[in-house]
Each structure stands twice: as structure tokens, then as C-alpha cells.
């Protein structure tokens, strides 16, 4: 199985602009990418970062084993096109033209990803296995069908169900809070701090930036220490 | 295993007040409760609704087998106290004083609950198994320890981890998007319509009320047909 991790290498995570400077957003996005790559390698696979611009894995905070297992492919086309160019086609991977090598696509902002959660996805038996995020996004999927193609525009989880149906592919929805939580908006930062482990880079970055959990009566939010806020 | 489903029988789901009338909120909350009870029975258990006021299961839209398997216990105390009164104590369930019967607590607003997702929770081996929701809530848990007690006030998932640690109970976090999605706010209604099945009552109610998925370019939202809006 190939595991592709799409990554917006320039101006990532603009929806966090209210709480993070551009430099912080870049550092945070790279920390999440490093956590995702680590989880993929721990799950026994060699991830390919599908980056919109050149990226040197040496500049990420990665264990040597993860860095060595990873590679980068640059493709500046929109996400859907770049991913589709990586999906299996009939004849890939086997001389007889029938076997194809499945391709997994795991978004780089799944900061809560763990090897266990990824293994549950990677071991799904269907032609297409999808992990939906909130709002019918597609946070991760595995494609083991030569005709299935992605369409990340709009309600992609619903689209992917339809596309699978249209090409005669079986589809399984994989139930995971960890993989179903993509980190896009300020409210999502709570999840990084609540569920991240001590060795994860993304929560460490947030703490460096001065974020901490604020436990009020009704719920948990993140707060940024006054003196650490961007001026 | 006992399965307890806490249910606010009066004025439920006030955070949906912007989009649903009080009567609609009551009907929707009861539809979600019926879906949760059905999933519990499909998972092989007999649910007890822990209601804040008297509730007649005959008035819920339930299959006969589910209605027959269910029961109601009324407890008008705050959630934490009412649940703690139901948790196992040392000596429960066995003559020798060592065996206890585990108790599961599944919230009534987990509209996406399925038998599969519940079975994954119910089969957890730890003394305490917790399904967190967004914002560090506790959406469901199974307690198989005589000293563990819940505290739903505030960041309950974090509190429950601490409480388990303090009483020497092992804790497992169960990873489920379906059980991790509680339906509290208008934005959550999208998930009911995206992930509900054809036989589920909660999405059927929303459609009766005039809600439908609105698939714009960027994301999916729910929209309510103009003529169906409360005046």
C-alpha cells in the first residue's frame, strides 16, 4: 500500500489566522505533518508527502527512521487532481493487469492520528474505505479500485460515496474520532491539547505559542497567554 | 452489563432553540433517544432510560422488541448524581463480594450511534472505557470498577481520566466518530442528515421539519425550507 499525505506547503491553515501568525501557522502545520508521518510509519508504511511546493524532510522534526521512510513528491495542481494522479489504475502493480496496489490518502492536519487508528483504516476490506470528518469532509481514505477517483470539492464524503457507487466499488465508512478530527479552526485546537500525547509535536508547538486548556464550568476552550499573543 | 441512557425529559436541547421550537426540540430529542435505544438493543443489551421526569416508552417511536427490552427509571437529581447512583459498588452482582456488573452510560443525543460502535465500546477490557466527544465531553462510558464515579461538570473526559487514575482503575479511550458526535448545536444537525440511515428516526424528524443538506462549494450545511420555519 502506498500512503500519500497531501500537504499545502505554502500559506497553510489560513482559517487559523485569527489566533496564529503566518509563521506560527507554518510551524504548526509542519508539526502536524510530522505527527501524521510518524503515525504512518508506526503503522508500518512509508509515507509520501504530496506537497504543493518543494519540502525538505530534513527540516521537519522527525525521528531518523521516519525521515528515512518518507519521501516527497511535488505537485502544485489542486488537491483533487494531484491526488487522482496518484490513485491506482488497472494494470498497476501486477504483470497480469488485474492486481492493483491500494493507495491511502491521509490529510496532513489529522493531528490526532495514531498508528492504531490508521491500521483500522488500512485494514478495511472494501474497495474504498473512507474516514469522514465533520461536515462531510473526507479526512482519509484507502482506494483499492482502478476506477475510483476523488473529488475533494464540497461535501466530499457524500460525493465519494456516490462515486464509489457509480464505478461499482464497495465502500466502507471507517468510524474514528481521531481521524475524523481535522484541525482547521481555532475551536479545533482544543482537541490537539486534549488528545495529543507527550511526544506529539503539534500540542508541543501550541504550548510553546502560549496556548493552554482553559477549563471553565461548562466546557473546555483554549486560551492564549496574554504576553504570548501576536502583536 | 447494565446500559443506562440519561435523558432530559423536560425542555431538552435548549441549544437548538435558534432553529427548533420547544415542541420540535422535544420531538427531536425523543427521536434521538429512540435511535439510541434501538442501537443498544441491537447490540444485545436492555437499556434503562434514566429520565429526569416520568416517560412512557409506549409514546416513543420504537419497535416492539426495543420497547419490551427497555425500562425507565426516574431520577430528577443532576446528571452526575443520578448516574453515580447507578454505578457499580463493591459487592454488587456476586455473592463473594468481588464481582461487579459493569454499567454503561450512553447519552441520549448520540444520534449516530450504531450497534457496531456500541459493541466496540462495550467490549473494551479496561476498568473504565470512555468515548470522548468534542471539547473533552464524555459521550459514553463503561464502568467496571467499584470506586470510579463520574463528574459530568466541565471537561469531563479529562476529569474522568484523572478520577480513574486516582482510584487505580485502568482507562481506555474508545475511538469513535459516531459515538463522539453528540447533537447539541445547529451545526451538529448536518451530521444527523449525513450519517443517519433510512430507518433512523432523528434524520426523519429533521426532514419532516423541513431541514435538508445544502451542498455549497466549500462545505455542507443544513438549511431549513423557508415555509417550514417556526413563525
Curated annotation (Swiss-Prot), chains A, B:
It comes from the Archaea. Keywords: GTP-binding, Nucleotide-binding, Nucleotidyltransferase, Transferase. Pfam families: CofC. One of its GO terms (molecular function) is GTP binding. It is an enzyme of class 2 (transferase). It catalyses: (2S)-2-phospholactate + GTP + H(+) = (2S)-lactyl-2-diphospho-5'-guanosine + diphosphate. Pathway: Cofactor biosynthesis; coenzyme F420 biosynthesis. InterPro entries: CofC, Nucleotide-diphossugar_trans. Guanylyltransferase that catalyzes the activation of (2S)-2-phospholactate (2-PL) as (2S)-lactyl-2-diphospho-5'-guanosine, via the condensation of 2-PL with GTP. It is involved in the biosynthesis of coenzyme F420, a hydride carrier cofactor. PANTHER family: 2-PHOSPHO-L-LACTATE GUANYLYLTRANSFERASE. HAMAP family: CofC. This is 2-phospho-L-lactate guanylyltransferase. It comes from Haloterrigena turkmenica (strain ATCC 51198 / DSM 5511 / JCM 9101 / NCIMB 13204 / VKM B-1734 / 4k).
